[in-house]
Amino acid sequence: MKNLFTNIILFVGLSIVFSGLTACSNTVSTQKGPVSETAPSVQNSNAAETKNDFPPVPTAIAQSEIKDLEGNTFKIEDKKGKVVLINLWATWCGPCRAEMPEFVALQEKYRDKGFEIVGLNTDNESVEEIKAFAEKMKLNYQLGYADGKILSEFIKITRLSGIPQTMIVNREGKMVLVIGGGGIRAVNNIKEMVEKTVNEG
């Protein structure tokens, strides 16, 4: 992967990119304090290129029973064999809204290649609010709610208490990219990694 940022750190093969300049404060987070605006960007180096170099999705995220808008539950681990993008968001978050059209395009482009987006609301907004918002934004991917365990795990990884936050999981159930914050650079990294991971087969 090209080095899009100046600070590059090898972290078990996992790419972690912090874009705090365009993150919203997450009122649901258990971690207090403002979102960092000077957090360093972190990417993997070329030393870790194989699928096996990536760490598995934390159990708290993989095995959490996620409630969707119809009241049904599902788990991220049930989607093993697919490339999954997990996005933490809320309707009031500007950077979250800004990246959604890109997510819609990604879902449409790669749906037939086993790619799924799961958008998890972090603010316990009502089903009616979320459905109305999804219709307005023409969201074409699965929506649900992020529980405390999922939020805590994202914060542990990114050390960022704001949203949006995004994780890309490969077909083996391993994290290949985690991004804290939004913005053009974050979206470009997401698009690049989705294309690469989907086409790995």
Give the positions of each predicted feature:
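Short, internal strand/loop/helix patches
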Residues: 133-171
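Rossmann-like NAD(H)/NADP(H) cofactor-binding core
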Residues: 86, 118, 144
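Structural microenvironment flanking redox-active thiols in thiol-disulfide oxidoreductases
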Residues: 97-137, 147-154
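Thiol-/selenol-based redox modules, centered on thioredoxin-like
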Residues: 41, 165-201
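N-terminal targeting signals for export/organelle localization
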Residues: 1-63, 201
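Short pre-active-site segment immediately N-terminal to redox-active cysteine/selenocysteine motifs
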Residues: 82-84, 88-92, 162
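A short beta-strand-turn-helix
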Residues: 56-58, 63-84
